[in-house]
């Protein structure tokens, strides 16, 4: 398991990709708590208060760019 600072999903980095960074505000007042590389996927976890929840998973077969 590796921790990641930023993940970008999509073939066209500048125009059509979705960018997610640790600390970014998302969904209903939550913040991205961590982005984790697992064996066959990347997982994004969000946090609100003390509660951390799984939010999104991305298959490793997708066009992905990561920053550590």
Q: Can you say where each PLM-predicted feature lies in the sequence?
A:
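Short intrinsically disordered terminal tails
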Residues: 1-2, 67-68
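A short beta-strand micro-motif
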Residues: 2-16
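Acidic, low-complexity, intrinsically disordered interaction modules
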Residues: 17-63
